[in-house]
């Protein structure tokens, strides 16, 4: 060919310095060793179930409070039931817009 063969372009890789930086670093986060004792395994599973139930109930309460009105997540449920917080004109609380 008159023009010559096309150049083979290599993909640019990481530089040697950035490759060396990440070696030897441990990943962030908590490390736990799985229990081997039967009693401890049961305790761990029970703790996991309880924490998931608590989180689910909190999420349900947040959704329920959010469906009632604007900023109702930040207010007490008692205020919402009495009707103070529905129209945004609570007695002396917060800014009126």
UniProtKB/Swiss-Prot annotation:
Chain residue ranges for the region called Disordered: 1-57, 75-97
Biased composition, class Basic and acidic residues, residue ranges: 29-46
Coiled coil: none
Biased composition (Polar residues): 48-57
Superkingdom classification of source: Eukaryota
Protein family (similarity comment): Belongs to the UPF0390 family.
Protein name: UPF0390 protein CND04920
Protein source organism: Cryptococcus neoformans var. neoformans serotype D (strain JEC21 / ATCC MYA-565) (Filobasidiella neoformans)
Lineage of source species: Eukaryota, Fungi, Dikarya, Basidiomycota, Agaricomycotina
């Amino acid at each position: 060919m008159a023009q010559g063969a096309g150049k083979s372009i290599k993909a640019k890789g990481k530089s040697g310095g950035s490759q060396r930086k990440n070696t030897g670093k441990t990943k962030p986060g908590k490390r736990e060793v799985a229990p081997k004792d039967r009693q401890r395994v049961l305790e761990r599973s029970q703790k996991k179930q309880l924490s998931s139930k608590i989180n689910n109930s909190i999420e349900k309460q947040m959704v329920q409070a959010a469906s009632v009105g604007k900023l109702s997540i930040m207010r007490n449920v008692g205020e919402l039931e009495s009707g103070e917080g529905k129209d945004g004109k609570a007695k002396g609380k917060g800014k009126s817009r």
